[in-house]
UniProtKB/Swiss-Prot annotation:
The gene is glgC. Homotetramer. Disulfide bonds: none annotated. Belongs to the bacterial/plant glucose-1-phosphate adenylyltransferase family. CDD domains: ADP_Glucose_PP, LbH_G1P_AT_C. This is Glucose-1-phosphate adenylyltransferase. InterPro entries: ADP-Glc_PPase (IPR011831), ADP_Glu_pyroP_CS (IPR005836), GlgC_bac (IPR023049), GlmU/GlgC-like_hexapep (IPR056818), NTP_transferase_dom (IPR005835), Nucleotide-diphossugar_trans (IPR029044), Trimer_LpxA-like_sf (IPR011004). Its EC number is 2.7.7.27. Involved in the biosynthesis of ADP-glucose, a building block required for the elongation reactions to produce glycogen. Catalyzes the reaction between ATP and alpha-D-glucose 1-phosphate (G1P) to produce pyrophosphate and ADP-Glc. Keywords: ATP-binding, Carbohydrate metabolism, Glycogen biosynthesis, Glycogen metabolism, Nucleotide-binding, Nucleotidyltransferase, Transferase. Pathway: Glycan biosynthesis; glycogen biosynthesis. One of its GO terms (biological process) is glycogen biosynthetic process. GO terms for molecular function: ATP binding; glucose-1-phosphate adenylyltransferase activity.
Length: 404
């Protein structure tokens, strides 16, 4: 119970993540690994559990097997307490022979789950962002303002509005207009160059949500941002929750207390990793008072047999033999052989970097074998001929692309 209300959560975890290709070639976006031993979905699930929201349905669709296995291994809540569960829900075709047609449709097709739990409030959260949030504070705001629906909001630069739902509010914080990914938008009052954007996190009063979903479905509307929320602006009381007011315990003075990143592109995903590195990171992965949970790991600790390591994170089971690693994140069971150099890079699980190989500004997905002496990130044209390279020059080696 939060603010005297029972709460049910739906997590939108069915996204294809085409802008993260090739990392999403064999997995959904929420299942993409992040940092030392997490996956992107772990952030929203940790925020829900830390906020004492334990009734959680995870709605999946696109290439979901990797995500399903991760939830099975990592996210088992006690079955002894009623309404303590994290349940994966693939498309059930409850409304006919079709998959989920959008975010709102995925909840509409599972209205029977709401009827089963009978919560006072329903929270609908995305699964593809890196952040910490005490969701109880947003729920309290929803109750205190007598809202029908509440949208978590954050300021963004005007040049990014085409990637977000854009909100216009009155002086009391009531949403008067909602546009999904417009080409342009008016700046916030007294804040030139900045617009107010939806974070894709919502709180609904249950009866309002059920009615709005039913109405949207009857008109062919399948998406919260495109259809449901714009239609509700005039007919219902929609409030914007200022994410910058959210306070999570354990945040250090040097951290960005309002850190939130959409990691839906390769460049954004790459940059977010480096926000976790250094002596004073913008986002510290370690916070005992608000942990980001991950799968239990039985692997042995990392071993370094000489070499040079600076401002790096090494996962369990990593083996470094007289190699150089700078400003990089190395995930579990990676082997870095003698004379190899890794700089400004992310190397994922069970990859071997051969002797004398050099890697910089790259993302190496799981299960790769980098041959001895190979160079990645030093010749853009040569890299483009073999790998995916972003416009900013980040090289991505797909999962298992390079074999021994």
């Amino acid at each position: 119970m939060i603010a005297g209300k029972s709460v049910l959560a739906f997590v939108m975890a069915g996204g294809e993540g085409s802008r993260l290709h090739p990392l999403t070639a064999e997995r959904s976006k929420p299942s993409v690994p992040f940092n030392g031993r997490h996956r992107i979905v772990d952030f929203v699930l940790s925020n829900l559990v830390n906020s004492e929201i334990y009734s959680i349905y995870l709605l999946v669709q696109y290439k979901s097997q990797s995500l399903i296995e991760h939830i099975r291994r990592s996210w088992v809540l006690t079955p002894l307490i009623p309404h303590h569960f994290i349940t994966v829900v693939p498309p059930q075709m409850q409304c006919g022979p079709e998959w989920f047609q959008g975010t709102a449709d995925s909840v509409y097709q599972n209205l029977h789950l709401i009827d089963l739990i009978k919560p006072d409030l329903v929270v609908v959260f995305g699964a593809d962002h890196v952040y910490r949030m005490d969701i109880r504070q947003m729920v309290q705001y929803h109750v205190d303002t007598h809202a029908d629906a509440t949208v978590a909001a954050i300021p963004i630069p005007l040049e990014q509005v085409s990637s977000f739902g854009i909100i216009r509010t009155d002086s009391a914080g009531r949403i008067r207009d909602f546009q999904e990914k417009p080409q342009s938008a008016e700046p916030m009052p007294n804040r030139p160059g900045v617009a107010l954007a939806s974070m894709g996190n919502y709180v609904f009063s249950t009866d309002v949500l059920v009615d709005a979903l039913t109405r949207a479905h009857s008109k062919g509307g399948h998406d919260f941002g495109k259809n449901l929320l714009p239609a509700m602006c005039e007919s219902h009381r929609l409030m914007a929750y200022d994410f910058s007011s959210n306070r999570v315990p354990g945040i250090r003075d040097f951290e960005d207390a309002s850190y939130w990143r959409d990691v839906g592109t390769i460049d954004a995903y790459y940059a977010a990793h480096f926000d976790t590195l250094g002596e004073c990171p913008a986002f510290c992965m370690s916070n005992p008072r608000w942990p980001i949970y991950a799968a239990p790991d039985q692997t042995e600790a990392a071993q370094v047999h000489d070499g040079h390591i600076r401002s790096a994170s090494l996962g369990a089971g990593v083996l470094v033999r007289r190699a150089t690693i700078e400003r990089s994140l190395i995930r579990r069971e990676v082997v870095v052989e003698e004379g190899a150099e890794v700089a400004d890079s992310i190397v994922m699980d069970r990859t071997v970097i051969g002797a004398g190989a050099k890697i910089r500004r790259a993302i190496i997905d799981q299960n790769n074998f980098i041959p001895p002496g190979m160079r990645i990130g030093y010749d853009r044209e040569a890299d483009r001929a073999r790998f995916h390279v972003t416009d900013s020059g980040i090289v991505v080696v797909a999962k298992g692309q390079l074999k021994p």
